[in-house]
């Protein structure tokens, strides 16, 4: 996704005039050195932009106000180089609506034991300047992140980079438009929800477009464009005999390409970066979009089936969060179980729509097979197995008075047998801490059957996401025990009830 050049993060130094112009000159020099080094050596995902020193209430307020109105600014990293009285920050922080991180660092790593004097002490006061700043954040009940460590420390770099991804994701989410082609799958509860509340909370908008509008665009795609895209299919995928030239399902592949081009044109023209479909609302389309959806997800679009706009939005958000990281992120569904003593497994898939970003390295297979649901022509799809290793599945649900994010840590494993009659992409995993505990906890917490599956992101990423958006998070991992989990659900009811 071309998102790296769209955003930057501002680096703000807090100080005061108490120490005189020479100290402020040194503070500025240190700040310039640190920012230049971080931009060139720390492998941060986004550029740090140094702003003028914040030494008075008016200066700080101006920086925060400017940050709010600059669409390129994804958030603020604040370094309290000297002591910076926190009352100076109140007006600015009151109006700030961008993510905030305090980098609790100092210019020197080691103390100069033989030469340290009070001038050095006054210049390098992060140790208590950061605490003063932390107090005002706590007093104002303002959520902000804190990273402690020397500015040359790789772990600090990684944590700042992770926070940057969250900040950019939040900014991107404020501009996110979700298109629903048709409505929800009829009578399904968890895919429904309050779209107005979601826009107030997260910033993304959700609107429905009749499938007929999409069909008009699909039908306008030229044969030349279709053939060019099919040539791309030929080079990227292993085509089954039925899908090759003169194959009995070749026309289905051509139609899938036409749908993909039409969908992408519709989404681009509308400024949409997430969308849903439903097999119950396909009037005018010749097949359920399988291959088109898979390829659009791989390009960074959020998607979910059956009108599930919350999961579609979450997928787009998590794709932005994971931009540039190794591993993929996909729409997923817990489909069926393998019960075996000590080796319980979950087979995840969907009817067609699993993102190739999570596939093993070899070329996916492009095939056309019968689909009994939807009542349309046989759809094209990519078939592949998934990479192994640690992963997460996440679900965002609407509880009426709040949103709850559920995260289950999992371990993806290799499929022990071939699946010759299962013509869909799939993932096989062990749920942590075990399948009975994980499934019971998930069900008790109201988790959806649709999830976002990710090898690229981890539990810490999702904790940051929940904190930044001020929503509840419920975690199921190797530390989960059902009695304590149930207690936590009850305590959360009380806590969030008091906050209403």
UniProtKB/Swiss-Prot annotation:
Annotated GO MF terms: L-arabinose isomerase activity; manganese ion binding
Pathway membership, UniProt: Carbohydrate degradation; L-arabinose degradation via L-ribulose; D-xylulose 5-phosphate from L-arabinose (bacterial route): step 1/3
Residue numbers binding Mn(2+): 306, 333, 350, 450
Alphabetical list of InterPro entries matching this protein: Ara_Isoase_C, AraA_central, AraA_N, AraA_N_sf, Fuc/Ara_isomerase_C, Fucose_isomerase_N/cen_sf, Lara_isomerase
Protein keywords: Arabinose catabolism, Carbohydrate metabolism, Isomerase, Manganese, Metal-binding
GO terms under cellular component: cytosol
A GO biological-process term: L-arabinose catabolic process to xylulose 5-phosphate
Function: Catalyzes the conversion of L-arabinose to L-ribulose.
HAMAP family given in the database record: Arabinose_Isome
Assembly and oligomerization: Homohexamer.
Family: Belongs to the arabinose isomerase family.
Alphabetical list of PANTHER family matching this protein: L-ARABINOSE ISOMERASE
Name recorded for this polypeptide: L-arabinose isomerase
